[in-house]
């Protein structure tokens, strides 16, 4: 009599599931090859995987790179993937926060250059350490440059000043 439960297959993964997981490991390995050395050093990786990731840039031919990345995927099987994903997510999050902060400062610069005294007052309220006279002078120079269609050297100085104030206020300086 044939057992209709198929208990022997309940705990096993299908071939498709295994291939999908291996493909995800290869993709994670590809992502790791794009990271800088100091970032890779923070990840909990084996020495063999670190060496394989360093060698990945040497393989430029499509077939060789694909073979090597399959090898990296194989090495990824024994890694602590949860810790790697957690650190990568943390780095993405901090990168996203940095980009949001950067865009916020760019918007402040544009508002100050295109705006009026109200925008300057709002900025000073948000950043109380602002040297009004210096900021007003930088903004005035940037406005003159913009009116004359010159390269935005003064606008860059305004941004640098705003960024320095932001870093000072957040305790990064």
Curated annotation (Swiss-Prot):
Coiled coil regions in record: none
Assigned GO CC terms: cytosol
A single GO molecular function term of this UniProt record: ribosome binding
InterPro entries listed in its UniProt record: DarP (IPR006839), DarP_sf (IPR023153)
Location(s) in or outside the cell: Cytoplasm
This protein's record includes keyword Coiled coil: no
Gene Ontology biological-process entries: assembly of large subunit precursor of preribosome
Function in brief: Member of a network of 50S ribosomal subunit biogenesis factors which assembles along the 30S-50S interface, preventing incorrect 23S rRNA structures from forming. Promotes peptidyl transferase center (PTC) maturation.
NCBIfam families named in the record: PRK05255.1-1 (NF003593)
Record-stated family: Belongs to the DarP family.
Record protein name field: Dual-action ribosomal maturation protein DarP
Underlying gene: darP
């Amino acid at each position: 009599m044939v057992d209709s439960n198929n208990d022997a297959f309940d705990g096993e993964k299908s071939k498709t599931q295994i291939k999908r997981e291996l493909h995800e490991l290869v993709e994670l390995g590809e992502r790791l090859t794009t990271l800088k050395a100091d970032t890779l050093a923070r990840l909990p990786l084996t020495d063999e995987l670190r060496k394989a990731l360093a060698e990945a840039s040497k393989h430029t031919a499509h077939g060789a790179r694909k073979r090597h990345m399959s090898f990296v995927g194989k090495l990824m099987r024994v890694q602590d993937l949860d810790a790697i994903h957690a650190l990568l997510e943390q780095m993405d999050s901090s990168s996203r926060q940095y980009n949001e902060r950067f865009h916020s400062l760019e918007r402040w610069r544009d508002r100050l250059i295109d705006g009026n005294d109200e925008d300057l007052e709002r900025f000073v309220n948000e950043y109380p350490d602002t040297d009004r006279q210096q900021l007003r002078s930088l903004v005035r120079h940037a406005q003159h440059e913009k009116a004359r269609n010159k390269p935005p050297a003064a606008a860059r100085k305004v941004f640098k000043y705003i960024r320095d104030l932001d870093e000072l206020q957040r305790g990064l300086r």
